[in-house]
Amino acid sequence: MAKVPDLFEDLKNCFSENEEYSSAIDHLSLNQKSFYDASYEPLHEDCMNKVVSLSTSETSVSPNLTFQENVVAVTASGKILKKRRLSLNQPITDVDLETNVSDPEEGIIKPRSVPYTFQRNMRYKYLRIIKQEFTLNDALNQSLVRDTSDQYLRAAPLQNLGDAVKFDMGVYMTSEDSILPVTLRISQTPLFVSAQNEDEPVLLKEMPETPRIITDSESDILFFWETQGNKNYFKSAANPQLFIATKPEHLVHMARGLPSMTDFQIS
């Protein structure tokens, strides 16, 4: 089965996108007077269990800090925590302090998968056709053929393999080395396979010509081609949790996995 985006990959992206955090804190420690350099008066009894402003015997300029974004961390036991990130924009207010005291166990967050289009603003540049006039067979050895409506595809057992739909595969270039974006066009036609929502049939979308540049808004005709042995998977670029799939008595559609079959053989 092809791999799908997991939580820890999302966390790695989160940290890599915010790697300037540590350098910002280092800069702060070198250029600001230490918070602990100042001496403070003991608290009176009537200040216990309250949020108070600490008075200092020295006059110092407090660094301007604000809560800006969340930094996600995972403990050794697998517990996911949310910690606040500091930046040099606005001063901390008493409201912020009150929030911290009243909510000491702030923000245990649930694992979630970030949508692909949220993480990236991708552009895909056309390179060339890498496969021509090939057929796709599913795990039941059924070939993909055009439905009677001519708008959809379906899987069917064929005696004459010449009746199977033949595809051309165009490959696109992107900055991501770990993915191989491709289009599936019915050979000698302007019809491209177009991904839809989960459990919805894929459409045959007419394009006047092969797109030279594809952006996120047009990524329904783009798929990430993955292989495992002789099995081939086509993951939607518009929704990477969905694959081109077949199921008995159903049109070719988009699915996450079983009971639909998402692997194909190319011949």
Swiss-Prot record:
GO terms for cellular component: cytosol; extracellular space; nucleus. The keyword Ion transport does not apply. It is found in: Nucleus; Cytoplasm; Secreted. It holds the Pfam family IL1_propep. The modification Phosphoserine is found at S87. The modification N6-acetyllysine is found at K82. GO terms for biological process: cellular response to heat; cellular response to lipopolysaccharide; connective tissue replacement involved in inflammatory response wound healing; cytokine-mediated signaling pathway; ectopic germ cell programmed cell death; extrinsic apoptotic signaling pathway in absence of ligand; fever generation; immune response. PROSITE patterns: INTERLEUKIN_1 (PS00253). Glycans are attached at N64, N100, N141. This is Interleukin-1 alpha. It comes from Oryctolagus cuniculus (Rabbit). The lineage of its organism: Eukaryota, Metazoa, Chordata, Craniata, Vertebrata.
